Amino acid sequence: MSTSKALTDCIKSFLSACDVPLEKSTYLETGLLKGDSVQLALDLNFKKIISIDIDKSAIDNANQRFKNDVLDSRVLLVQGDSQKKIKEIFDQSINIIYLDAHNNDVDEETIAPLENEIKFLLDNVNEKQLIIIDDYIKIKNSYLFENNDKSWKSKLSYKKLKEIISYKGLNIFEIFSSSGTNCHLLLTKNKNFRIEKILFLRNLINRFISIKFYYKKNYFRFMFKKLIIFLL
């Protein structure tokens, strides 16, 4: 889970709208890395935290880092391909689902599980469950990475993602981080959920700041080259 205040505020707001206290809610994530997101979920006071990662060494390290919480059954660490494991673990009691397993150093065939994860979840989630997709700004601009076959960002195009989510009757929000280099896509079947006004205004500001991402990725140079090629 990201440390973005905008995102954590959205999570709290969603749970409140669903009348589910944080301390009684369950958080599921795909993509563990060093376990910082598990720590954040603990700090937010989730009752149960589940993390799936294909990297055994990451799971082993996290088992040591969170050994007391694992022993107390507050944290469950699952090793395996997230697009398969999520089908085994998912149930209606999970409130927040954070998808961040895209990219790993273990198996190139599984670096982009997002498409299968989303397809499964959208067929099974209820109105009290929120799906969060990390790195959405990179997916939205996947054409910047289309020449890199080994990058997860080239495996799921923005067009493909839009097709997957467009017919599901979803309430959709794009939440930008204050860093200007990331944003999250939030999906829910809860039509009554709305972002609070202050958060909405803050998100507009963060959207403007996201120009940093395009600057870092040489977006303007990229578009200029495309224009020159077109004119020639």
Predicted feature locations:
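A short alpha-helical cap/connector motif
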Residues: M1-I96, H102-L232
